[in-house]
Amino acid sequence: MLVPLSPLARTVVVALTIASGWTGVTLTLRAQQSGSRPMTFLDMQQMRQVGSPTPSPDGRWLLYTLSTPDWTEAKRQTDLYLVSIQQGVASTRQLTFSKEKNETSPRWARDGSSFLFLSNREAPENAASRNQLYQMRPDGGEARRLTDAKEGVSDFSLSRDGRWVVYRSGKSDEEQLYRLPIAGLDTAVAEAMTKHPTGVRSWQWAPDSKRIYFVTPDSVDLDDKARRDKKFTINIRNPETPVASLWALEVDGPQTTKRLTEGGAFSVDDVTVSSDSKWIGLRGLSPDRYKRGITSENIYGDLYLIDATTGAVERLTTNAEIGESPISFSPDSKSFAFSGPDDLQTYGMSNNRVYVRAIADRGKPFQKRGETFDGDVSVGFWSKDSATIYFNEGIRATNQIVSLDVRYNTVRPLTEEKAAVSIDRDEDTGVLLIDYSDGTTASTLFTVDAIANVSTRASWRQLTDPNPQVRAFALGQQEEITWRSKDGTTVGGVLVKPVGYRAGQRYPLIVAIHGGPASADILSFNGGYGSQVYAGAGYVVLRPNYRGSTNYGHKLKTDIVGNYMAPGYDDIMAGVDHLSAQGIADPARMGALGWSAGGHWSNWILTHTDRFKAISTGAGTMNWISLYAQSDVQRNRQYYLGNKLPYDDFDAYWNQSPLKYIKNAKTPTMIHVVEGDPRVPSPQSIELHMALKQLGVPSELYMYPGNTHGIPDPRNQFVKSVSEMAWMDFYVRGQGTKFAWRDVLKTLEDEAARPKVVTEQDAKR
């Protein structure tokens, strides 16, 4: 009989057996039977990521970045790769080999003879992250540096007419635009295009290459800048800041600039330009200091349309607390569209619809599209004839590619994959790129020749294979399931069975609760906080899409409004009972875990039942009254909890607070939070830990450095995952010794012997 190992022991043993070439009886019996090994948390840290896919102007080649993690050093290293779009993944070539440095943001020259990119390969040690601009040929050879910007290059873009590359550089809040002629890159000296006193915050080319539009603050507070330079780094909440305006820079001639928005009525954001360069769409944010520069600033903005020739401004929306999407122009530049709530006047969680109008129909009402679809309708990209809009949308436990016929107002899913599928199109070349992930396939990029062929998997061509090591993992079977909740509501979710699952045998259960709550668990690879690692260790994992989740229609998403916690709790517990009734889960061995909203419901479970043997809660609330002021978002809390301010209805907030019921807590609970979390600040977790400590309930509080809602450091992500699983093993299965730092330190030592991920293309070189 084999004794299951602790989470760290599993990780270390797998690493050592691979490094030595020995794969004996140290793996679990289930993994031996499948001829593979279970997935570990170290494997999760080693997953490589594809980014910045960029087709060549002739549509024959694809440049992309491949990011390789080094979790022991808490960093990632990025190189550039090239693949033939017609030949597919077998033709992949690595173009850069910078080891400790990075190459990012590849962009093709318009004639396809070379490409440009950013890199810190020659950056000094005291400015290691500072990028410069480089040029390289796709057929190989050494890259050539084009810039020597003192402060580095922030970003760059090439004009569509192929004449110029423009980049942004300078000190923070003082960045300016510079240009180099493509025809003379060998000897060219950068020419300053702007000398704006407040710098350039964001910018983009007009498609006709005659103008550059940039956004910049109206003024600079020199005293505020001086105090920061003098290290008076006090953080002032909602400081007075200048609004930002839109400017036009003429590329040819004397390079004059012209201000297009003024008066302080709004602050410019999310600028888009029509393909004929005659129209500009933008979001105007509120000038109110308390409604701008905050996480939810978009809901206080409105959309505007500007005539690029005359400068005439048309306000398109006039509503409070509605966050429309940016404007998207049709390819023929005759119409525009944006997405927003079904009720375009009232804040809420109603399904998004698409609103369309001809540009010439100034002042006329929008045409609402997609009303009959019980899900969100959005604007991804238009068909070439401007008749159809394509977008990606969650449908039950999947993500699919969907079309909206603008003229006939019909919505139709184009794919029916038991997977996570999304599509994007390169606007210059029309190349279609599909991202695909399922229970056994990590995120992989494909292409298809025409949108009409998207529904036929056989017509897809694979372009990337960033994580071939996944094929060696013993993975649990993943499937979508449904069950009936306490009130008869049909609820869905994802079930991950243990590796080597045998019908009729009961397994320890982990309930992995997603955040949001306006989100959903889908049939992608290794979702649910590492569900495949738990499956490899002998657990069955339930990832419930409880009420409040997306993908299952408007009613399920909004059923928690005014009664936030109870319906979702009922759904989760009914799912647990369903698995027990099916003979899959052992009701005597159950644990629950979650982050953010998943932490909220973990805390509610803690204070409403003792059926679970262990809980691990991350960034969860305890007291909605105090969280309202502590958090960086307020309006959605108010909406969910009855649509009143807490000061007008304390009971509505308190009745939904786990702290009110804390004396019911009996379950050993591990707590995780980032110290500077802005969304669910750490005092919520500290409050829970103190209460459990005083009530005599076993508890551990892990506080991670950082100022983000998620754990930023890969090393600490690893610690969180391993300590969490050790907590489950100890209390749910009665195994192991909880968490030991010595094991983590040993893992760091053993990682040096662990072979790096090698793709087939790497091996060929």
What do the PLM-derived regions correspond to, one by one?
Residues 530, 535-536, 543-765:
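Active-site-proximal cap/loop segments of hydrolase catalytic domains
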Residues 59-62, 112-116, 162-165, 212, ...:
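Hydrophobic beta-strand positions that form the internal "hydrophobic ladder"
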Residues 66-79, 96-104, 118-134, 142-154, ...:
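A flexible loop/linker signature enriched in serine peptidases of the S9 family
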Residues 85-88, 137-141, 181-186, 250-254, ...:
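Short loop/turn segments that connect beta-strands within beta-propeller blades
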Residues 57-58, 110-111, 160-161, 207-208, ...:
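Residue-level detector of Asp-centered blade-edge/turn motifs that repeat once per structural unit
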Residues 54, 212-216, 222-224, 238-246, ...:
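Non-catalytic accessory segments flanking enzyme active sites
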Residues 502-507, 512-552:
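Short substrate-entry loop that stabilizes the transition state in hydrolases
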